[in-house]
Amino acid sequence: MQIDEKQKIFEEIFAPKSGEKVLVLVDIPHNDILDNEAWKKRREMAKEWYESFKEMGKKTGFTVDFKKYNATGLQNTLIPKDILDKISDANLIIAMTEYSGSSSLITLCNKKGSNTRIASMPKVEKRMEKTAIKANYSEVNSYANSIKKMLTKANGAEIIFSTGDTLFIDLRNRKGKSDKGDCSKKGQFINFPSGEGFIAPYEGAADEIKKFGESKTKGILPDNQHGKLIKYRVEKNKIVDVIGNSKKAEERRRFFSKNDTRRNIAELGIGCNPRAVVTGNILEDEKVGGLHIAYGSSNYLGGKTKSDLHNDICFPKGLPAEVKTLTLMNKDNSKIELIRNSRLRYEIL
């Protein structure tokens, strides 16, 4: 992508203004957190974006900085406070990292009186400049807002997977949110490339269980992300068991036993970026028209659970576990089949 093309996207999505401070942020390998080729290329891409922002800043009147920090080693684990303090004076932060820092970075945007807006781009790849990054974001905005409204009106979601498994996700007492590709105003936080509507499921936390009862989230959750298909048994919005006795199943049991909060069903997300393609990269896969479900932290999405990570499972067409149908059960007892035959129904958005 040429500099002028980048700058057009920067203006549309980020709208940096005269007098502002723009920061391009990367994480770096250290100690036993080893480098890899994709990570190296991402840091090169970050440098290219930094240079493009600098050229744009000369004309517009904003300044640009480039900062590095030692990688955390886990997706959405906490970034140390001293790092957050050092970057908190930036007006616009572009975080092009190996390990997602979204759950920490969003706290800078949520602070009272915050002047910071952030685009989190974990595992971004340069090829995305030709796919999801180049989407028509006015169109994406419209789709994401429609999904947000649908999720807010729903009490639950019934999901049928191609494996024959079913899962009900409790959406009571929660509000839908959208990631629509707008990072132009202070306090805004986006995942970029963007394009999804999402909601944190109802967990039945201590401060709400008396009024709303236990979570009704229950069923079998397939996981495509670990080389072979794994299935989790879910009850009351928690992963209570990993099905099977394979080596991979035992590994997953140990993973969840390290921190009980990892068991929390943290997100139901619906991707809606027509330019996104499936390649195995979660950042873009979850923006493809379809479903993703996450476990771990939900507190920064409107839920109640804080964990040491937030991991997404995507269900695009072509993987061992697809979503055949996803039906929203509304508060007025009506139903909306949002995904049919493994395809998001863009025509109803």
List the model feature ranges, each with a label:
Residues 1-220, 225-227, 327-349:
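Active-site bordering "gate/hinge" segments
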Residues 19, 218, 229, 236, ...:
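Active-site lining segments that contact anionic ligands and/or coordinate catalytic metals
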Residues 158, 168, 222, 231-233, ...:
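Structured core elements
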Residues 163, 215, 262, 285-287, ...:
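A short, structural micro-pattern
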Residues 211-213, 223-224, 231-233, 258-260, ...:
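Short, conserved, surface-exposed binding loops centered on an aromatic residue
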Residues 218-254:
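Long, well-ordered mid-to-C-terminal structural blocks that present hydrophobic/aromatic surfaces
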Residues 241-304:
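Dual-mode signal for accessory low-complexity, basic/Gly-rich regions
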Residues 278, 284-348:
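Internal helix-turn-beta structural module
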